[in-house]
Structure formats: C-alpha cells, structure tokens
Amino acid sequence: MRELNDVYDVVVVGAGPGGSMASYASAKNGAKTLLIEKSQEIGEPVRCAEAIPSIEEFGLKPEPEFVRNIIKGGILFSPSGKKVTVTQDKAQGYVVERKIFDKYLAIRAAKAGAKVAVKTTAIGLERDGDYWNVIVEFLGEEYVIKTKVVIAADGVESNIAEYAGLKAKKKPLEICSCAEYEMTNVELLDKNMMEFYFGNEVAPGGYVWIFPKGETANVGLGVRDKKKKAIEYLEEFIENGLAKDRLKDATPIEFKVGGAPVSGPIEKTYTDGLLVVGDAAGQISPLTGGGIYLAMDCGLIAGEVASKAIKLNDWSEETLKEYERRWKEKHYEYLMSHLKYRKILEKMSDDELDALAEALGESLDGIDLKKFVKRIITKKPSLLKYFKDLL
C-alpha cells in the first residue's frame, strides 16, 4: 500500500470518532497526516449504544445518512420499576448508525487532506531521533512509517500509549463489559426517549439501555461483574426484566460486544511526539459510559495541537502539553464528578436505588447533578451518607 511507504508529520492510530476528528483537524491545518485502522472497514465492528449529545459544534449537520433518531430525554427505572422521566425543551442528542457515522468522519478527514490506510495494524513503536517509527502490519507484511507525531486513538485496548511509556492499560474491573442486540419489533414507551434500567441484579456496576433507532432499537447493557458474562445478564433482562412484555415480540438483527473504560482519564495523555485520545485516554464518562462526543472533541484538540507543533517545528513534550491543558479545561471536572457519582451508585443497595428514584420524583427538566443531590438529601435524608461530600 503506497500510503505506508512515506514519511508523515502526524500518524493517527485508530479511525473511530476521536481518530478521524484528530486526522481532520491535523490535515486541515496543513500537517501531512496518515490515519490507520486495523479493521478492513471503518466503523466495523460496532461496539457501543450509538448515542451522542451533539454534533453541530463540530461543523456537522444531522444528516439522514447516519442519524437514526433524535433524542429528547430519558426515562430512568429503579430496580422495582419506579420511573423518573428527564426531558429538555430542545433536542438532547442523536442515535447514530456508527458504521456509517464513523466512515463519514473518516471521509471528511480524507477530504481535508489526510491519507487513510485500512486493515493496517500498529504492532510496535520505536523512537528514531526526533521521529517515531510506527511499525505496522498490512496483509502479512511489515512496514515502518516514520512520523513526527503519533496520536494514539486505538481504543480501550490501546497499546500505542504503552509503547511510548505512558500508563494506559486498564484492570479488568476498570472496564465495563457491554453486550447489545439491535432488535426489531420492540414496543417503545416513546420513540424519542432513551430508557435506562438500574439495579444490582439486572446490571451490577452498570445499567441496561433501550435506545430507539427508527425501525429498530438498541437493547443492551454494561456490567462490571465477575459472576456472569454481559450477554447472560442481557438475555435475563430480555426474558424477565421490567421491559419483558414490550420485548416479547422483539427479535435481534445484529449483536455487538465491547468494553468501556470507566475508571476516569489516564494519568498523562502526552509525551514527546505523542498524544492519547478517546477511550485510550479514558476520556469517557465513568457514569454513563458515553464517549463519542468526548472522543471527537479531544480528537479535534489533539489534531490542532499536533499541527501547530509541526508549524513550530517543535513536537516536544513541552509543546504538546497544551493538548492536556486544553482538554482538561473543558472536560476534566465533568469526568471526575461522574467518577464520584458512579462510585456512589455502586455502593447503593436496590432498596436505596428505589429510594433515590422516589426522591428525584417522576419528572425532571434537564440534568443538573448538583440539583439532583440537593433534592435527594432533602427528600431522603437517609441517603446523606452517600452524597454529603458532594455538597
């Protein structure tokens, strides 16, 4: 492949939303950029529930090509079935077709000037003076790609950051195991509302979701548990869970599995000539497991910082630390607060989760975690022990 026999300013490893946005920003700002993806097709395999709160700020329009549904809120269910409806006046987000959306973002990067190499796996990384040698495998052959800056957007199983000496590996229980069916004939409560089901029996350390997707719906869950596999919990929910009557005629048309790192961001996301983005960097909500938007925004910042470093002819750690400063200014507080809330929810019994739902009430306008906490403590003082440090 001719793209592998060249020298680049920036090589991005991983063509998920974060990697494609990094490639787009890098190429748009004049850096000679290569985006490599280990799969033979960008967007495959799909590994997530496919919800994203916003795309307009990235200069994207919600094209019918990839948007499957507009989301206006969510319905939360406690273990016993107590319901809390969260709504907003304006559209809260979208459910996208990831296999199309990811490809759309990669095409956008290519149109900005980035080269793309698929079925190309990064198997090593070596320092070569001021450059990196990215060792890749394509169709059984090894290639060495020389580059000034590497952007590691290679997902939860990231090796690139580790090759560069950054600590990115996650322990098993720091990863939420996910399983999901895309199903048809699902009876929805509301075609524009996502559904979430909580409980230590139904999804320990996580939750079940039902996301409307036009003619179909994503029915899945994430768990942090050693007792059973995620798919076993999912099958039990479909057969015996709170939504069983609405799922009795549902049938799967696609099955997806994956993992979401929910332990918060890694300690350091930059070093000489290298930046880490998205799931690889732990830039994903520890509470919801949502990471598409965060990966895109952090990827955009990484691409801008990398291309700026090329123009300065200085891609040292000192120059690249701007990336971590910028993404932390926007997202670090959000991530760490979600980590605190996740740890609180994990300590609660099912009875306490029911009490929590009762305290929140049947409906909420918008999501404001601080207001949630005040309402909870006022209505259910017994839960103060969990939330007192957040006041």
UniProtKB/Swiss-Prot annotation:
GO terms for biological process: glycerophospholipid biosynthetic process; membrane lipid biosynthetic process. It catalyses: a 2,3-bis-O-phytanyl-sn-glycerol 1-phospholipid + 8 A = a 2,3-bis-O-(geranylgeranyl)-sn-glycerol 1-phospholipid + 8 AH2; 2,3-bis-O-(phytanyl)-sn-glycerol 1-phosphate + 8 A = 2,3-bis-O-(geranylgeranyl)-sn-glycerol 1-phosphate + 8 AH2; CDP-2,3-bis-O-(geranylgeranyl)-sn-glycerol + 8 AH2 = CDP-2,3-bis-O-(phytanyl)-sn-glycerol + 8 A; archaetidylserine + 8 AH2 = 2,3-bis-O-phytanyl-sn-glycero-3-phospho-L-serine + 8 A. Pfam families: FAD_oxidored (PF12831), GGR_cat (PF22578). Keywords: FAD, Flavoprotein, Lipid biosynthesis, Lipid metabolism, Oxidoreductase, Phospholipid biosynthesis, Phospholipid metabolism. Its EC number is 1.3.-.-. The keyword Ribosomal protein does not apply. GO terms for molecular function: flavin adenine dinucleotide binding; geranylgeranyl reductase activity; oxidoreductase activity, acting on the CH-CH group of donors, NAD or NADP as acceptor. Pathway: Membrane lipid metabolism; glycerophospholipid metabolism. It is an enzyme of class 1 (oxidoreductase). Binds 1 FAD per subunit. SUPFAM superfamilies: FAD/NAD(P)-binding domain. InterPro entries: DGGGPL_reductase (IPR023590), FAD/NAD-bd_sf (IPR036188), Geranylgeranyl_Rdtase_fam (IPR011777), Geranylgeranyl_reductase (IPR050407), GGR_cat (IPR054715). GO terms for cellular component: membrane. Belongs to the geranylgeranyl reductase family. DGGGPL reductase subfamily. Reduction reaction proceeds via syn addition of hydrogen for double bonds. Is involved in the reduction of 2,3-digeranylgeranylglycerophospholipids (unsaturated archaeols) into 2,3-diphytanylglycerophospholipids (saturated archaeols) in the biosynthesis of archaeal membrane lipids. Catalyzes the formation of archaetidic acid (2,3-di-O-phytanyl-sn-glyceryl phosphate) from 2,3-di-O-geranylgeranylglyceryl phosphate (DGGGP) via the hydrogenation of each double bond of the isoprenoid chains. This is Digeranylgeranylglycerophospholipid reductase. It comes from Methanocaldococcus jannaschii (strain ATCC 43067 / DSM 2661 / JAL-1 / JCM 10045 / NBRC 100440). The lineage of its organism: Archaea, Methanobacteriati, Methanobacteriota, Methanomada group, Methanococci.
